Amino acid sequence: MKKRVTLSAVALVAVLASAVQAQPVARDGLLADAAGRTVYTFDKDTAGKSNCTGGCLAAWPAFVAKPGAKPQGDFGLIEATGGQQQWTLKGKPLYYFAGDTQAGERNGDGSGGVWHVVPAPAKY
């Protein structure tokens, strides 16, 4: 039992560490992380505040910034669940979609009529 718990804890740390990212980048006209994973916005969020909690975060994980990341231009940071920093664009929190398993996928676009891919800003 102890071995199983230890392995589960190690796996969880690996997953959380892989979700921590540098500032978004432009890829194929959309915002993505450095690995090419598409990021999304949620219409029910308000500027500077995420309204995606609980089960929502399981399907739409926050796009979490690396420790020490600094806001730049239209990109900002808000406190995410767990005390980490979540990237924002013009105050709108950014997320991944758990259903996107490969770089460049956009399977969450339009989901529920409230989730959207993010076009890369023109100056990007």
Q: Can you say where each PLM-predicted feature lies in the sequence?
A:
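Bacterial N-terminal signal peptides
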Residues: 8-17
